[in-house]
Amino acid sequence: MSAVLAPTVRIQRQDFDVAAEIAALTQGRADVGAVVSFSGLCRDEQGALSALELEHYPGMAEAEIGRIAAEAVERWPLQGLTVIHRHGKIRPGENIVLVVAASAHRQAAFEAANFLMDYLKSRAPFWKKEHRTDGSEGGWVEAKETDTQAAKRWKSSSE
């Protein structure tokens, strides 16, 4: 019987190194045949954003993301899973989120990473506030309907 994979979930203020996180997940592993990573960056679409401030309720965010990461491990045959989400003020071009899924085969890794990102974009307990280059504060950013719809494709028939 194989050991149950414990996903790595971190909520942190500091930046992360994508290559280092992938290396940490795959170092010395001969059972991994595919690694899919998604790194989400802070984007400034109109040239007016100085920072995006992400707030979370400590404990709740880790528990919720841990729950969905555990569901990914149950649904797909993964050899490794890392989810990192930052909080605090994040400037355009900086990392916000990282999902790294490792599996023996690519389909499981791709699907698990997609599943996690759809969840993170629509239901993870983070609140985002825009800070503009003119010194003003923008509004709180809501989840997009397209993100909510994307997450619905993963619901099981029992939900």
Swiss-Prot record:
Entry-linked Gene3D superfamilies: Molybdopterin biosynthesis MoaE subunit
GO BP of this protein: Mo-molybdopterin cofactor biosynthetic process
InterPro entries recorded: MoaE_sf (IPR036563), Mopterin_biosynth_MoaE (IPR003448)
Residues binding substrate: 41-43, 105-106, 121, 128-130
Keyword Transcription regulation in record: no
One GO MF term attached to the UniProt entry: molybdopterin synthase activity
EC top class named in words: transferase
Recorded metabolic or biological pathway in which this protein acts: Cofactor biosynthesis; molybdopterin biosynthesis
SUPFAM superfamilies to which the protein is assigned, alphabetical: Molybdopterin synthase subunit MoaE (SSF54690)
UniProt-annotated stretches for the region Disordered: 130-159
Pfam families per record: MoaE
Keyword Cell cycle belongs to the record: no
Subunit structure and binding partners: Heterotetramer of 2 MoaD subunits and 2 MoaE subunits. Also stable as homodimer. The enzyme changes between these two forms during catalysis.
Function: Converts molybdopterin precursor Z into molybdopterin. This requires the incorporation of two sulfur atoms into precursor Z to generate a dithiolene group. The sulfur is provided by MoaD.
Name used for this protein in its record: Molybdopterin synthase catalytic subunit
Organism encoding this protein: Mesorhizobium japonicum (strain LMG 29417 / CECT 9101 / MAFF 303099)
